[in-house]
Structure formats: C-alpha cells, structure tokens
Amino acid sequence: MNRSFLFAPGNVPRRVEKALTLAADAVILDLEDSVAPSDKPGARKSIAEALRGPRKARGYVRVNAPSTPFCFRDLLETLHARVDGVVVPKIESAADLH
C-alpha cells in the first residue's frame, strides 16, 4: 500500500534521481503539466534511465493525457524501464482510455 507519493518533474534529471532515493512509498515522475513540449523527449529519457537504476521507492510515470499527441510516445519510451505503474491524467470515464 502506498501511503505517500512524491511528485518530481521529469525534465530535471537531478530531481528525478534524488526523488527515487527518498523515503516516499512511491515517486510519480511527471511528463505532463510540469514539462514543456520541447522538454518532453529529454524528460522521457531521464525518467527511463533513472527507473533502471537503484531506488528505494516505487516508480510511477505520469504520462500526458490520451487526447494529446504526447501520450503514446510517453508510454513507448518509458514502459521498457522498471515502471511500477502509470498515472493517466484528465480521465473522465473509462471510454477516455479506449
């Protein structure tokens, strides 16, 4: 059970790496609102690399909303790392995930 969640912006590699070493039960690495479109490719790479390394916390990736042009690439470039879960924002119903 996750009792605490720590959010970290995916486009700041130092914060991503540091967050994964802290005592939170889960770290949510954000690719959505905290990352400008031009920074998304680097953020995806940073997140994938950090999740493959040593860590204390579970690692979740907060992808962009499925209605955006970024969601598929977020999934494609991060899920091969040791991701414990995916956070999908801006979902109003199950139909939004189909």
Model-derived segments and spans:
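Expand to "…catalyze enediolate/carbanion chemistry for C-C bond making/breaking, isomerization
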Residues: 1-98
